[in-house]
Amino acid sequence: ASDRQKSQEGNYWDIFLNLNFDYDTRNQKFQTTDGSRNRYFVNLPMISETSTITNTYIYKIYGEMYESNVSSFSVYLKSSNSLKSKDIKLSERILLPSNRLRGFERGKFGPKDGDDFIGGNYAAAFNFSSTIPKILENSENIDFLFFLDAANVWGVDYFNGDDEGSEIRSSIGIGIDWLTPVGPLSFTLAEAITKSSTDVTESFRFNLGTTF
């Protein structure tokens, strides 16, 4: 880690006000077939060393492209900046959630400081998925899907290394969403389409929990 990166480490005592706005018209939370969801989150600094404000906007819409098909498109935008024009803390830097860019290890792409991935001040992701015809009989609780992801993390306020911000990452793959008695399970098999030479890819991923 660089000296500048080490200077951002330490313990801090901060107070933030979190505001959430959620407009949901989905017909159901799991295996959604119609509707959309708009979410906006803002993290306002009340008492903070860096006075960092974080904004997040998430939009997802569902619909049918053909009979017995469900397709979705989502947008994820996030920013984190200091109101005092200071360098934000390492813990306040942005890493994309794992379901926003499948085919890559979480936190293992984007800006680097030496050998360390440090996240960015900005992130954006665009995700498209579409169900494919049922392969198994009596599989109402299982969705087979095809997906395409494109995303980027960029911006280093103290820039002291490789931003890698010009590289748009993208991936393609197939997945299974399965509603079980223990909860929703998700399995994905993905392949990176575009990436940076420093990125760490990940072909298979398993998640316990919802994918919406």
What is each of the regions a protein language model found here?
Residues 150-172:
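Outer-membrane beta-barrel transmembrane domain signature
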Residues 2-142, 146-150, 154-156, 198, ...:
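C-terminal outer-membrane beta-barrel translocator/porin domains of Gram-negative envelope proteins
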Residues 18-19, 176-183, 201-212:
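Outer-membrane beta-barrel "beta-signal"
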Residues 35, 97, 103, 169-175, ...:
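Glycine-centered small-residue hotspots that permit tight backbone geometry or close packing
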Residues 140-144, 168-172, 181-185, 202-204:
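A short pocket-lining beta-strand/turn micro-motif at the edge of beta-sheets
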Residues 130-133, 174-179:
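Short basic/hydrophobic patches in alpha-helices and adjacent helix-turn junctions
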Residues 117, 121, 161, 165-169, ...:
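Short amphipathic alpha-helix initiation/capping segments at coil-to-helix junctions
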Residues 190-195:
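A short, acidic, flexible beta-alpha connecting loop/helix-capping segment that sits on the rim
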